[in-house]
Design a protein with these regions (language model features):
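Accessory, usually C-terminal, subdomains that scaffold auxiliary metal cofactors
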Residues: 190-241
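Phosphate/adenylate-binding glycine loop and adjacent helical scaffold
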Residues: 1-197
Length: 241
């Protein structure tokens, strides 16, 4: 039986190969594909630096700029978007074949919900809405779910902002809440060692960490943000019925 870890590694390798084939160099052990995919729906407005720095949450603005530059030099955002769609269909067929038919059938109802959600303050959600909706029924259903995910994510980041967390600090709290290896998430999102160290100092100054570890207060804040995110993002499921 294949373990979830080995499946994830296989998926990562397959996904990375898509971007290597487009001559996208590897960054921090992975491709710049994550930044490129997230931003694909927002180009060309991302040429404005302030948007790059404000909409990606705890992802390093420098990493975002690097990924943008790599895409512009070696491929197009449309090709990156298409490669992701191809990988999604292949991954669903291989790892979750049982949801293909339900996802295709639910697509129209999901889009009906998506179209009724408020857009104010939801940058990624609104940007994804401007992208063409796939003709493939399965992929269309997946894109609708992805829009719901982005709507939740935008809502969550509003709460992170309200908690006065910025830079690598949200990644540090989330990293501890999930139980990842220390500083893995901040590093994977492009933060430098100095930036991460400064974030630790800021968290300790607020009583959210001590001696290089997120403490109970920090974990409680992260849990409260998650609970409030759940409360504020119940609307799609209420509309779906």
């Amino acid at each position: 039986k294949t373990s979830s870890a080995s499946r994830s590694k296989t998926d990562e390798d397959r996904f990375t190969n898509h971007f290597v084939s487009m001559k996208l160099p590897l960054v921090h052990g992975t491709s710049g594909s994550f930044f490129a995919l997230c931003s694909g729906s927002q180009t060309p407005v991302w040429e404005q630096t302030t948007l790059k720095e404000s909409a990606f949450g705890s992802i390093s603005p420098k990493g975002i700029a690097l990924a943008m530059d790599l895409v512009e030099k070696h491929t197009t955002f449309q090709d990156v978007w298409a490669a992701r769609d191809e990988a999604v269909l292949a991954g669903l067929a291989e790892h979750a074949p049982g949801i293909l038919e339900p996802l295709a059938k639910m697509g129209p109802d999901l889009w009906s919900v998506v179209d009724r959600l408020p857009r104010l303050g939801r940058v990624f959600f609104a940007a994804h809405l401007r992208m063409p909706r796939p003709a493939d029924a399965v992929l269309s259903g997946w894109h609708a779910v992805n829009c719901l995910r982005e709507w939740r994510g935008d809502t969550h980041w509003a709460l992170v902002t309200a908690a006065d967390l910025s830079g690598p600090a949200p990644s540090i709290l989330h990293n501890a809440w999930i139980g990842y290896e220390k500083d893995w998430l901040a590093t994977s999102r492009g933060s430098t060692a100095d930036e991460t160290a400064a974030a630790w100092d800021a968290l300790e100054a607020r009583g959210l960490a001590a001696d290089g570890e997120v403490n109970a207060s920090g974990l409680d804040l992260r849990q409260r943000m998650e609970d409030e995110t759940d409360r504020l993002t119940a609307l799609p499921w209420t509309l779906l019925g």
